[in-house]
Amino acid sequence: MFHAEFKSISGEDTYPLSQIVYKDKNGSLLEVSHNRSAWKLRSPEEWKILFGSRRSSFAPADLSGVWSKREFVLPELPAEDIVTLQEGWSPLFNAQKLAEEISIKSLHVKLCGNSHTGSFKDLGMTVLVSQVNHLIKKGTSIKAVACASTGDTSAALSAYCAKAGIPSIVFLPAGKISVAQLVQPISNGSIVLALDTDFDGCMKIVQEVTADRSIYLANSMNSLRIEGQKTISYELCQELGWILPDVIVIPGGNLGNVSALAKGTDDLLAIGLIEKKPRIIVAQAENANPFYNAYKRNFDKLEAVQAKKTLASAIQIGNPVSYPKAEQAIKNYNGIVEQVSEQELSDAAHRADKIGLYCCPHTGVALGALFKLREKNSISSEESVVIISTAHGLKFSEFKAGYHEQTLSGITPKYANAIRRLPPTVGAVMDALKEMI
Protein backbone atom coordinates (compact mmCIF):
# COMPACT_ATOMS: atom_id res chain seq x y z
CA MET A 1 0.00 0.00 0.00
CA PHE A 2 2.52 2.63 1.15
CA HIS A 3 5.46 2.88 -1.25
CA ALA A 4 8.36 5.24 -1.94
CA GLU A 5 11.06 5.46 -4.61
CA PHE A 6 13.60 7.92 -5.98
CA LYS A 7 12.32 10.13 -8.80
CA SER A 8 14.05 12.80 -10.88
CA ILE A 9 12.89 16.35 -10.12
CA SER A 10 13.11 17.25 -13.82
CA GLY A 11 12.02 14.07 -15.57
CA GLU A 12 10.25 10.76 -15.20
CA ASP A 13 13.24 8.58 -14.27
CA THR A 14 12.67 6.49 -11.14
CA TYR A 15 14.96 4.28 -9.09
CA PRO A 16 14.32 1.93 -6.16
CA LEU A 17 15.46 3.11 -2.74
CA SER A 18 17.75 0.08 -2.67
CA GLN A 19 19.84 1.61 -5.46
CA ILE A 20 22.79 3.85 -4.56
CA VAL A 21 22.03 6.88 -6.72
CA TYR A 22 22.08 10.63 -6.06
CA LYS A 23 21.21 12.16 -9.46
CA ASP A 24 19.40 11.02 -12.58
CA LYS A 25 21.18 10.15 -15.83
CA ASN A 26 21.10 13.82 -16.89
CA GLY A 27 22.56 15.12 -13.64
CA SER A 28 19.33 16.39 -12.08
CA LEU A 29 18.65 15.98 -8.37
CA LEU A 30 16.30 13.28 -7.12
CA GLU A 31 13.50 13.32 -4.61
CA VAL A 32 11.79 10.56 -2.69
CA SER A 33 8.42 10.12 -4.37
CA HIS A 34 5.51 8.59 -2.46
CA ASN A 35 2.30 6.86 -3.44
CA ARG A 36 0.13 9.67 -2.13
CA SER A 37 -3.08 7.92 -3.15
CA ALA A 38 -2.41 5.44 -0.34
CA TRP A 39 -2.25 8.30 2.16
CA LYS A 40 -5.81 9.24 1.21
CA LEU A 41 -7.15 5.88 2.36
CA ARG A 42 -7.25 7.60 5.75
CA SER A 43 -9.15 10.84 6.16
CA PRO A 44 -7.37 13.94 7.50
CA GLU A 45 -9.16 13.46 10.82
CA GLU A 46 -7.98 9.85 11.05
CA TRP A 47 -4.37 10.96 10.45
CA LYS A 48 -4.73 13.57 13.20
CA ILE A 49 -5.99 10.95 15.64
CA LEU A 50 -3.19 8.52 14.72
CA PHE A 51 -0.44 11.11 15.04
CA GLY A 52 -1.94 12.41 18.27
CA SER A 53 -1.89 8.92 19.78
CA ARG A 54 1.76 8.45 18.80
CA ARG A 55 2.69 11.70 20.54
CA SER A 56 1.92 10.02 23.87
CA SER A 57 3.35 6.61 22.91
CA PHE A 58 6.58 5.16 24.31
CA ALA A 59 7.19 2.86 21.35
CA PRO A 60 10.78 3.45 20.09
CA ALA A 61 9.70 4.78 16.68
CA ASP A 62 7.03 7.03 18.18
CA LEU A 63 9.56 8.72 20.47
CA SER A 64 11.05 10.19 17.27
CA GLY A 65 9.35 13.14 15.64
CA VAL A 66 10.50 11.71 12.32
CA TRP A 67 9.51 8.06 12.64
CA SER A 68 6.19 8.85 14.28
CA LYS A 69 5.26 9.99 10.74
CA ARG A 70 6.87 6.92 9.15
CA GLU A 71 4.15 6.38 6.52
CA PHE A 72 5.27 9.66 4.95
CA VAL A 73 9.02 9.06 5.29
CA LEU A 74 10.27 5.54 4.48
CA PRO A 75 7.09 3.47 4.78
CA GLU A 76 8.65 0.14 3.79
CA LEU A 77 11.67 0.29 6.11
CA PRO A 78 11.56 -2.51 8.73
CA ALA A 79 11.20 -1.15 12.25
CA GLU A 80 14.25 -3.11 13.41
CA ASP A 81 16.47 -1.23 10.93
CA ILE A 82 15.58 2.23 12.22
CA VAL A 83 18.52 4.10 13.79
CA THR A 84 17.05 6.75 16.06
CA LEU A 85 18.34 9.02 18.81
CA GLN A 86 14.85 10.34 19.64
CA GLU A 87 15.22 13.26 17.26
CA GLY A 88 12.45 15.72 16.58
CA TRP A 89 9.57 16.80 18.78
CA SER A 90 11.59 19.96 19.42
CA PRO A 91 10.04 22.81 21.44
CA LEU A 92 8.05 25.61 19.83
CA PHE A 93 9.02 28.74 21.77
CA ASN A 94 6.32 31.39 22.08
CA ALA A 95 8.11 34.70 21.43
CA GLN A 96 5.03 36.87 21.90
CA LYS A 97 7.00 39.63 23.64
CA LEU A 98 9.18 39.99 20.55
CA ALA A 99 6.07 39.84 18.34
CA GLU A 100 4.66 42.80 20.25
CA GLU A 101 7.92 44.73 19.87
CA ILE A 102 7.80 44.45 16.07
CA SER A 103 3.98 44.60 15.85
CA ILE A 104 3.03 41.28 14.29
CA LYS A 105 0.20 38.93 15.20
CA SER A 106 2.34 36.18 16.71
CA LEU A 107 5.89 34.83 16.66
CA HIS A 108 7.13 31.36 17.51
CA VAL A 109 10.63 29.93 17.24
CA LYS A 110 10.96 26.24 16.37
CA LEU A 111 13.99 25.11 18.40
CA CYS A 112 15.36 22.41 16.09
CA GLY A 113 18.71 22.66 17.87
CA ASN A 114 17.16 21.00 20.94
CA SER A 115 18.14 17.62 19.54
CA HIS A 116 20.71 14.91 20.21
CA THR A 117 23.62 16.56 18.37
CA GLY A 118 22.33 20.12 18.72
CA SER A 119 20.99 20.83 15.23
CA PHE A 120 18.17 20.07 12.80
CA LYS A 121 20.54 17.81 10.85
CA ASP A 122 19.51 14.93 13.13
CA LEU A 123 16.13 14.85 11.39
CA GLY A 124 17.62 13.97 8.03
CA MET A 125 20.44 11.81 9.30
CA THR A 126 18.20 9.34 11.10
CA VAL A 127 16.53 8.57 7.76
CA LEU A 128 19.73 8.31 5.75
CA VAL A 129 21.61 6.16 8.25
CA SER A 130 18.56 3.94 8.80
CA GLN A 131 18.38 3.26 5.06
CA VAL A 132 22.13 2.55 4.93
CA ASN A 133 21.72 0.21 7.90
CA HIS A 134 18.95 -1.59 5.99
CA LEU A 135 21.05 -1.84 2.81
CA ILE A 136 24.03 -3.27 4.69
CA LYS A 137 21.80 -5.87 6.36
CA LYS A 138 20.51 -6.80 2.90
CA GLY A 139 24.07 -7.41 1.70
CA THR A 140 24.96 -4.15 -0.06
CA SER A 141 28.70 -3.47 0.15
CA ILE A 142 29.00 -0.13 1.95
CA LYS A 143 32.30 0.44 3.77
CA ALA A 144 31.53 3.87 5.22
CA VAL A 145 29.28 6.93 5.01
CA ALA A 146 30.87 10.30 4.18
CA CYS A 147 29.92 13.97 4.18
CA ALA A 148 31.36 17.42 3.67
CA SER A 149 30.33 19.70 6.48
CA THR A 150 30.48 23.14 8.02
CA GLY A 151 30.01 21.42 11.37
CA ASP A 152 26.46 20.30 12.08
CA THR A 153 26.13 17.63 9.38
CA SER A 154 29.34 15.96 10.53
CA ALA A 155 28.11 15.90 14.13
CA ALA A 156 24.84 14.24 13.12
CA LEU A 157 26.46 11.74 10.76
CA SER A 158 29.05 10.67 13.31
CA ALA A 159 26.50 10.15 16.09
CA TYR A 160 24.03 8.12 14.03
CA CYS A 161 26.75 6.03 12.43
CA ALA A 162 28.24 5.37 15.86
CA LYS A 163 24.82 4.19 17.09
CA ALA A 164 24.51 1.87 14.08
CA GLY A 165 28.13 0.66 14.16
CA ILE A 166 28.82 2.00 10.65
CA PRO A 167 32.16 3.77 9.90
CA SER A 168 31.87 7.46 9.00
CA ILE A 169 34.15 9.96 7.29
CA VAL A 170 33.79 13.74 7.55
CA PHE A 171 35.46 16.38 5.39
CA LEU A 172 35.72 19.73 7.17
CA PRO A 173 37.12 23.11 6.03
CA ALA A 174 40.18 23.56 8.26
CA GLY A 175 39.83 26.31 10.87
CA LYS A 176 36.32 27.33 9.84
CA ILE A 177 34.04 25.60 12.38
CA SER A 178 33.52 26.02 16.11
CA VAL A 179 35.33 23.90 18.68
CA ALA A 180 32.02 22.38 19.81
CA GLN A 181 31.24 21.32 16.25
CA LEU A 182 34.72 19.92 15.67
CA VAL A 183 34.85 17.82 18.81
CA GLN A 184 31.54 16.05 18.15
CA PRO A 185 32.68 13.84 15.21
CA ILE A 186 36.02 13.28 16.90
CA SER A 187 34.28 12.03 20.03
CA ASN A 188 31.96 9.72 18.09
CA GLY A 189 34.87 8.05 16.32
CA SER A 190 34.56 9.44 12.79
CA ILE A 191 37.53 9.67 10.46
CA VAL A 192 37.95 13.46 10.49
CA LEU A 193 39.72 15.07 7.52
CA ALA A 194 40.37 18.83 7.77
CA LEU A 195 41.02 20.24 4.30
CA ASP A 196 42.63 23.58 3.49
CA THR A 197 39.62 24.80 1.54
CA ASP A 198 36.07 26.01 2.14
CA PHE A 199 32.87 23.97 2.31
CA ASP A 200 32.40 24.08 -1.44
CA GLY A 201 35.89 22.63 -1.90
CA CYS A 202 35.10 19.86 0.60
CA MET A 203 31.83 19.16 -1.20
CA LYS A 204 33.60 18.77 -4.53
CA ILE A 205 36.03 16.25 -3.07
CA VAL A 206 33.42 14.20 -1.20
CA GLN A 207 31.36 13.87 -4.38
CA GLU A 208 34.40 12.47 -6.17
CA VAL A 209 35.22 10.12 -3.28
CA THR A 210 31.65 8.79 -3.11
CA ALA A 211 31.63 8.09 -6.84
CA ASP A 212 32.98 4.79 -5.48
CA ARG A 213 29.61 3.43 -4.36
CA SER A 214 31.18 1.59 -1.43
CA ILE A 215 31.41 4.98 0.33
CA TYR A 216 27.89 6.37 0.72
CA LEU A 217 27.21 10.10 0.33
CA ALA A 218 25.42 11.75 3.26
CA ASN A 219 25.09 15.35 2.09
CA SER A 220 21.70 16.86 1.30
CA MET A 221 22.03 16.18 -2.42
CA ASN A 222 21.09 12.71 -1.18
CA SER A 223 17.32 13.11 -1.09
CA LEU A 224 16.91 10.72 1.85
CA ARG A 225 18.02 13.57 4.10
CA ILE A 226 15.16 15.73 2.88
CA GLU A 227 12.64 13.08 3.98
CA GLY A 228 13.64 13.52 7.60
CA GLN A 229 14.00 17.27 7.49
CA LYS A 230 10.55 17.74 5.93
CA THR A 231 8.97 16.52 9.17
CA ILE A 232 9.61 20.01 10.59
CA SER A 233 6.48 21.00 8.64
CA TYR A 234 4.49 18.14 10.16
CA GLU A 235 5.58 19.01 13.70
CA LEU A 236 4.79 22.70 13.26
CA CYS A 237 1.36 21.87 11.91
CA GLN A 238 0.59 19.49 14.77
CA GLU A 239 1.92 21.86 17.45
CA LEU A 240 -0.14 24.78 16.13
CA GLY A 241 -3.38 22.80 16.09
CA TRP A 242 -3.17 21.50 12.51
CA ILE A 243 -2.58 24.83 10.84
CA LEU A 244 0.60 26.49 9.62
CA PRO A 245 1.56 30.13 10.21
CA ASP A 246 1.24 32.81 7.54
CA VAL A 247 5.03 33.08 7.24
CA ILE A 248 7.94 30.71 7.93
CA VAL A 249 11.47 32.16 7.96
CA ILE A 250 14.39 29.77 7.58
CA PRO A 251 18.14 30.38 7.23
CA GLY A 252 19.64 29.10 3.98
CA GLY A 253 23.08 27.78 3.09
CA ASN A 254 23.16 24.58 1.07
CA LEU A 255 19.36 25.01 0.79
CA GLY A 256 18.34 21.47 1.72
CA ASN A 257 16.27 22.73 4.63
CA VAL A 258 14.05 25.08 2.62
CA SER A 259 13.57 22.30 0.06
CA ALA A 260 12.50 19.99 2.87
CA LEU A 261 10.17 22.57 4.42
CA ALA A 262 8.36 22.97 1.10
CA LYS A 263 8.19 19.22 0.50
CA GLY A 264 6.67 18.60 3.91
CA THR A 265 4.12 21.34 3.34
CA ASP A 266 3.29 19.84 -0.07
CA ASP A 267 2.53 16.59 1.75
CA LEU A 268 0.22 18.29 4.24
CA LEU A 269 -1.70 19.92 1.40
CA ALA A 270 -1.94 16.63 -0.50
CA ILE A 271 -3.37 14.80 2.51
CA GLY A 272 -5.82 17.59 3.26
CA LEU A 273 -4.38 18.35 6.70
CA ILE A 274 -4.04 22.02 5.70
CA GLU A 275 -5.71 24.12 3.01
CA LYS A 276 -3.73 27.37 3.09
CA LYS A 277 -0.10 27.70 2.01
CA PRO A 278 2.34 29.64 4.19
CA ARG A 279 4.85 32.02 2.65
CA ILE A 280 8.40 30.71 2.90
CA ILE A 281 11.22 33.20 3.43
CA VAL A 282 14.86 32.20 3.08
CA ALA A 283 17.42 34.27 4.98
CA GLN A 284 21.06 34.38 3.92
CA ALA A 285 24.16 35.99 5.36
CA GLU A 286 25.35 38.89 3.20
CA ASN A 287 28.78 37.25 3.08
CA ALA A 288 27.40 34.02 1.56
CA ASN A 289 24.43 35.04 -0.55
CA PRO A 290 24.25 33.25 -3.93
CA PHE A 291 20.56 32.39 -3.48
CA TYR A 292 19.70 35.99 -2.61
CA ASN A 293 21.57 37.21 -5.68
CA ALA A 294 19.71 34.74 -7.90
CA TYR A 295 16.37 35.80 -6.39
CA LYS A 296 17.12 39.46 -7.14
CA ARG A 297 17.74 38.46 -10.77
CA ASN A 298 14.40 36.58 -10.92
CA PHE A 299 16.25 33.24 -10.73
CA ASP A 300 17.81 33.59 -14.18
CA LYS A 301 20.59 31.26 -13.02
CA LEU A 302 22.71 30.40 -10.01
CA GLU A 303 26.05 32.17 -9.99
CA ALA A 304 28.28 30.55 -7.40
CA VAL A 305 30.21 32.96 -5.19
CA GLN A 306 33.32 32.65 -3.08
CA ALA A 307 31.65 32.72 0.32
CA LYS A 308 33.29 35.21 2.67
CA LYS A 309 33.80 34.53 6.34
CA THR A 310 30.58 34.87 8.31
CA LEU A 311 29.70 34.36 11.96
CA ALA A 312 26.93 32.09 10.64
CA SER A 313 29.56 29.54 9.67
CA ALA A 314 27.17 26.66 8.93
CA ILE A 315 25.70 28.61 6.00
CA GLN A 316 29.03 29.90 4.67
CA ILE A 317 28.36 28.23 1.33
CA GLY A 318 28.82 29.77 -2.10
CA ASN A 319 27.55 26.99 -4.37
CA PRO A 320 24.42 25.44 -2.81
CA VAL A 321 23.71 21.90 -3.98
CA SER A 322 19.94 22.08 -3.44
CA TYR A 323 19.46 25.30 -5.44
CA PRO A 324 17.00 23.83 -8.01
CA LYS A 325 14.67 22.52 -5.29
CA ALA A 326 14.92 25.74 -3.26
CA GLU A 327 14.15 27.89 -6.31
CA GLN A 328 10.99 25.88 -6.88
CA ALA A 329 10.06 26.21 -3.20
CA ILE A 330 10.26 30.00 -3.33
CA LYS A 331 8.19 30.12 -6.52
CA ASN A 332 5.55 27.72 -5.20
CA TYR A 333 5.21 29.40 -1.81
CA ASN A 334 5.14 33.07 -2.80
CA GLY A 335 8.51 33.34 -1.14
CA ILE A 336 11.10 36.00 -0.47
CA VAL A 337 14.86 35.75 -0.09
CA GLU A 338 16.50 38.33 2.19
CA GLN A 339 20.09 38.90 3.28
CA VAL A 340 21.49 40.33 6.51
CA SER A 341 24.84 41.78 7.50
CA GLU A 342 27.11 40.48 10.24
CA GLN A 343 25.99 43.36 12.45
CA GLU A 344 22.32 42.62 11.81
CA LEU A 345 22.56 38.88 12.51
CA SER A 346 24.57 39.47 15.69
CA ASP A 347 22.18 42.04 17.11
CA ALA A 348 19.11 40.04 16.09
CA ALA A 349 20.34 36.90 17.86
CA HIS A 350 21.08 38.75 21.07
CA ARG A 351 17.91 40.81 20.96
CA ALA A 352 16.00 37.53 20.98
CA ASP A 353 18.16 36.23 23.84
CA LYS A 354 16.70 39.03 25.95
CA ILE A 355 13.34 37.23 25.99
CA GLY A 356 14.77 33.88 27.08
CA LEU A 357 16.14 32.35 23.88
CA TYR A 358 19.79 31.42 23.33
CA CYS A 359 20.23 31.86 19.62
CA CYS A 360 22.89 30.50 17.31
CA PRO A 361 24.14 32.94 14.64
CA HIS A 362 22.09 31.20 11.94
CA THR A 363 18.91 31.84 13.88
CA GLY A 364 20.18 35.42 14.07
CA VAL A 365 20.19 35.47 10.27
CA ALA A 366 16.52 34.40 10.18
CA LEU A 367 15.53 36.88 12.89
CA GLY A 368 17.48 39.66 11.20
CA ALA A 369 15.60 38.98 7.97
CA LEU A 370 12.29 39.08 9.86
CA PHE A 371 13.15 42.47 11.38
CA LYS A 372 14.19 43.90 7.98
CA LEU A 373 11.12 42.61 6.18
CA ARG A 374 8.83 43.90 8.91
CA GLU A 375 10.40 47.36 8.57
CA LYS A 376 9.71 47.22 4.82
CA ASN A 377 6.16 45.98 5.58
CA SER A 378 6.87 42.89 3.47
CA ILE A 379 5.50 41.08 6.53
CA SER A 380 2.32 42.72 7.79
CA SER A 381 1.10 43.34 11.32
CA GLU A 382 -1.70 40.79 10.78
CA GLU A 383 0.59 37.87 9.98
CA SER A 384 1.71 35.00 12.21
CA VAL A 385 5.37 34.02 11.87
CA VAL A 386 7.53 31.02 12.78
CA ILE A 387 11.33 31.20 12.78
CA ILE A 388 13.18 27.93 12.19
CA SER A 389 16.09 27.88 14.65
CA THR A 390 18.53 25.40 13.17
CA ALA A 391 21.09 24.84 15.93
CA HIS A 392 21.62 25.25 19.66
CA GLY A 393 23.41 28.38 20.83
CA LEU A 394 25.68 26.29 23.06
CA LYS A 395 27.50 25.14 19.91
CA PHE A 396 28.52 28.76 19.33
CA SER A 397 29.71 29.92 22.74
CA GLU A 398 32.60 31.87 21.18
CA PHE A 399 30.05 33.92 19.23
CA LYS A 400 27.98 34.60 22.33
CA ALA A 401 30.94 35.50 24.55
CA GLY A 402 32.60 37.62 21.87
CA TYR A 403 29.44 39.66 21.38
CA HIS A 404 29.10 40.54 25.06
CA GLU A 405 32.85 41.08 25.49
CA GLN A 406 32.76 43.29 22.38
CA THR A 407 35.59 41.38 20.72
CA LEU A 408 33.84 40.32 17.50
CA SER A 409 35.64 41.95 14.59
CA GLY A 410 33.59 44.66 12.90
CA ILE A 411 30.65 44.32 15.31
CA THR A 412 29.41 47.13 17.57
CA PRO A 413 27.03 45.28 19.90
CA LYS A 414 23.69 46.95 20.58
CA TYR A 415 22.66 44.46 23.27
CA ALA A 416 25.98 43.69 24.98
CA ASN A 417 25.72 42.76 28.65
CA ALA A 418 29.14 43.38 30.16
CA ILE A 419 30.28 41.71 33.37
CA ARG A 420 30.82 44.24 36.18
CA ARG A 421 33.91 43.58 38.27
CA LEU A 422 33.61 44.94 41.80
CA PRO A 423 35.50 44.96 45.09
CA PRO A 424 34.29 42.22 47.49
CA THR A 425 32.28 44.57 49.73
CA VAL A 426 28.55 44.95 50.34
CA GLY A 427 28.84 48.70 49.86
CA ALA A 428 30.35 48.38 46.41
CA VAL A 429 27.73 45.84 45.40
CA MET A 430 24.83 47.95 46.66
CA ASP A 431 26.15 51.10 44.97
CA ALA A 432 26.45 49.24 41.67
CA LEU A 433 22.99 47.73 41.95
CA LYS A 434 21.45 51.15 42.57
CA GLU A 435 22.75 52.23 39.16
CA MET A 436 21.65 49.06 37.38
CA ILE A 437 18.21 48.31 38.79
Regions found by a protein language model. Name each.
Residues M1-I437:
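PLP-dependent amino-acid enzyme catalytic core
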